[in-house]
Amino acid sequence: MAKTMQLEIVSAEAAIFSGKVEMIVVTGGMGELGIYPGHRQLLTSLKPGQIKAILEGGKEEVFYMSGGMLEVQPEIVTILADTALRAVDLDEAAAISAKEEAERRLAKQKAGIEYSKAMTELAEAAAQLRAIQMLRKSAKKH
């Protein structure tokens, strides 16, 4: 039996996931992080991206988050996300539309607050699409 740790994923709206996992992969401020049971304590920011959790027994679950914070303690990992959704709940058409709209706005703006907002929206839409793609790859494996 593989070692596990408790994972809690919480957004401003609701608790998204609570359970035992064998491994977690998230997008940190400095790149991807792989967290296994026994990982050293850590507190870091998270960028928009996906959360991949390998559940007890090896099943994979994918989530989307718009950014937030990650806290790793000896027995528990907590992800406090601005927004978090299970990848199966994402709307691919809406994500593609949001990405295209953000790209159009970026083409018009060269600097300023609107440019920064469009960049953030583009990153979030791209992260949603990556989470959907990751979910599809996972489904093909099983």
Swiss-Prot record:
It is a peripheral membrane protein. It holds the Pfam family ATP-synt_DE_N. PANTHER family: ATP SYNTHASE DELTA/EPSILON CHAIN, ATP SYNTHASE EPSILON CHAIN, CHLOROPLASTIC. GO terms for cellular component: plasma membrane; proton-transporting ATP synthase complex. It comes from the Bacteria. It is found in: Cell inner membrane. F-type ATPases have 2 components, CF(1) - the catalytic core - and CF(0) - the membrane proton channel. CF(1) has five subunits: alpha(3), beta(3), gamma(1), delta(1), epsilon(1). CF(0) has three main subunits: a, b and c. One of its GO terms (biological process) is proton motive force-driven ATP synthesis. Its main location: membrane. SUPFAM superfamilies: Epsilon subunit of F1F0-ATP synthase C-terminal domain (SSF46604), Epsilon subunit of F1F0-ATP synthase N-terminal domain (SSF51344). The gene is atpC. Coiled coil: none annotated. GO terms for molecular function: ATP binding; proton-transporting ATP synthase activity, rotational mechanism. Produces ATP from ADP in the presence of a proton gradient across the membrane. Belongs to the ATPase epsilon chain family. Keywords: ATP synthesis, Cell inner membrane, Cell membrane, CF(1), Hydrogen ion transport, Ion transport, Membrane, Transport. This is ATP synthase epsilon chain.
